[in-house]
Design a protein with these regions (language model features):
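Transmembrane alpha-helix segments characteristic
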Residues: 23-30, 126-128, 132, 203-211, ...
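Specific aromatic-rich, kink-prone transmembrane helix
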Residues: 109-114, 131, 150-169, 189-191, ...
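Hydrophobic, aromatic-rich transmembrane alpha-helices
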Residues: 27, 110-112, 187-194, 256-301, ...
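Hydrophobic/aromatic-rich transmembrane helices and adjacent perimembrane loops
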Residues: 179-181, 185, 269, 309-335
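Transmembrane-helix motifs of polytopic, lipid-linked glycan transferases
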Residues: 99-120, 124, 157
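Membrane-interface alpha helices of multi-pass inner-membrane proteins
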Residues: 128-136, 156-158, 167-181, 187-192, ...
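Membrane-embedded, lumen/periplasm-facing catalytic core of multi-pass transferases
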Residues: 346-399, 405-445, 467-494
């Protein structure tokens, strides 16, 4: 059987970037990642949720957060299994996740530069390589222990394999779909350009994975995703404008949810024109993986904005990397004299200087999590019995360090919490009365104001519910008064 011929669209380049340029960019990539890893050896709070699932699997308890409770509170099946492999091999999950993320990122970078040089231009390849190597967000994601670089590597590898009509195309598509929900969307986009065999193989892998997840958890959809949708909703594009408005270099109109968007908005005069030029450049290359990968990223980005997905800083990986991808394509549209080393050198300087502003943001965020959550975890571990139930938020680092049974007040791993929060106010009072946890990990601001830290529904119906917690529980840590955003460890009175 003859394969259908793909439409022929001429590429502007047919050679890989020079070996010296490639290795120079990879050296910058490694240097930036290693610098961040040495400064921030601990992982992000949410990564520890995955690590606890992986730890239980590696120790024979199944892919669970609490032994015996089959709730899919992780977002990435494939990354969770990967972390379980590292634990089985004797590695600390933080070390395994961070340093293998670096390797996956380097693989993605090398492959992306090869494809951009082959189908767009060498300038595009080097420009994207510099952005991916030097923009601080990406180094922070490597250090986070989350699966975002793994996801991007999957997109690049799958797009490349689909274009090559390789035997690994279907496997790459199937595995990409199992990285995260965004990976499923990206895999569907890339599958539109795949041959029949790749679609069948990829579909079979997804069907097998979804079937196993449905068998174990009752649904192939992550419960964590359902919990976030319930707590934060999908309010639509106006509320979701924090995914788009940082494209404009107009700070007075910017509704950014965090420092990432504010910093990008200030540089919009540089990124936006290049990215706008990148759209027609991508259309010209529509028969190449360069365009397909861009389309996959744009689809995920548009989905975030259209649904009004709540902002979590690691979600910004795909929108920002897609912006840089399009900007790199746009550089190939500029006159030759404007795309040589002076422009790339200026871009590299801007990227490097961004560390002065953004490195303290990411390091401070990680330090704040660790210094706030770890002392609570140590205090709880030293006082609690193995069977003691803890009602807590956050649950990642505290849950991983203590390995105690957790009742999650956000509902990520506790369906009963989610069901009760759907009913409205008083959910905290009712859950404490029903489950009688010995320990509470709670923010003092919640007790002081009666307002939930996140999501729908007030925790107490009235002041009596709030006072009942203070009557039935007493604070055991910290000894000194805490700040409003700190945590209290409270024990049920005898």
């Amino acid at each position: 059987m003859h394969r259908a011929a793909r439409p022929t669209v001429k590429s502007r380049a047919t050679a890989a970037p020079s070996t010296a340029a490639t290795w120079a960019v990879i050296a910058l990539f490694v240097a930036a990642r290693v610098f961040m890893l040495l400064a921030q050896p601990w992982a992000s709070e949410d990564a520890y949720i995955t690590f606890r699932y992986a730890w239980h699997l590696a120790h024979g308890n199944g892919l669970v957060f609490n032994p015996g409770e089959w709730v899919m509170g992780f977002t990435s099946p494939l990354w969770t299994l990967w972390c379980a492999l590292g634990i089985t091999l004797g590695a600390a999950p933080e070390t395994w996740a961070q340093w293998t993320s670096l390797l996956f990122g380097a693989w993605a970078l090398h492959t992306a530069m090869q494809q951009l040089a082959r189908h767009a231009s060498r300038t595009s390849a080097v420009a994207f390589g510099l952005a991916y190597a030097l923009w601080p967000l990406f180094s922070a994601l490597t250090a986070s222990g989350l699966e975002m670089e793994f996801l991007f590597a999957g997109m690049v590898i799958a797009g490349t394999q689909v274009h090559a009509r390789g035997r690994g195309a279907g496997v790459a598509l199937g595995l990409l779909a199992l990285t995260r929900p965004e990976g499923t969307v990206a895999a569907l986009v890339l599958a539109c350009f795949a041959d029949r065999r790749a679609r069948l193989v990829g579909g079979a892998i997804v069907a097998l994975g979804a079937g196993l997840l449905a068998w174990a958890y009752g649904s192939p959809l992550p419960h964590s995703v359902l919990a976030k949708r319930t707590l934060y909703g999908t309010p639509g594009p106006w509320v979701g404008r924090h995914w788009l408005d940082w494209l404009l270099p107009l700070p007075m109109l910017t509704h950014t949810a965090a420092r990432e968007g504010a910093h990008l908005a200030r540089l919009g005069w540089l990124w936006l024109p290049a990215a706008v030029l990148g759209v027609p450049a991508g259309f010209r290359l529509r028969a190449t993986p360069v365009a397909w990968i861009a389309l996959a990223g744009l689809t995920v980005w548009a989905g975030y904005a259209a649904l009004g997905v709540a902002y979590f800083w690691w979600y910004s990986m795909i929108p920002v990397v897609t912006l840089f991808w399009l900007a790199a394509l746009g550089l190939s549209r500029l006159p030759r004299w404007a795309t040589r080393w002076p422009v790339l050198a200026a871009a590299a300087l801007i990227l490097a200087l961004s560390w002065l502003d953004l490195f303290p943001v990411y390091l401070g965020r990680a330090q704040n999590e660790f210094r706030t959550f770890h002392p609570i975890a140590d205090a709880l571990r030293s006082r609690a019995r193995p069977s003691d139930l803890v009602m807590a938020e956050p649950i990642g680092l505290i849950g991983f360090v203590t390995m105690l049974p957790i009742l999650d007040e956000s509902g990520l791993v506790s369906p009963e919490t989610l069901q009760r929060r759907k009913l409205g106010d008083g959910w905290y009072t009712d859950l404490v009365a029903r489950r009688q946890p010995r320990w509470l990990v709670i923010r003092p601001a919640v007790l002081a104001t009666g307002e939930a830290f996140a999501g729908r529904g007030r925790p107490f119906r009235d002041d009596a519910g709030r006072l009942a917690i203070l009557r039935d529980y007493h604070s055991v840590w910290p000894v000194a008064p805490a700040q409003s955003d700190a945590l209290w460890l409270m024990e049920r009175r005898p």
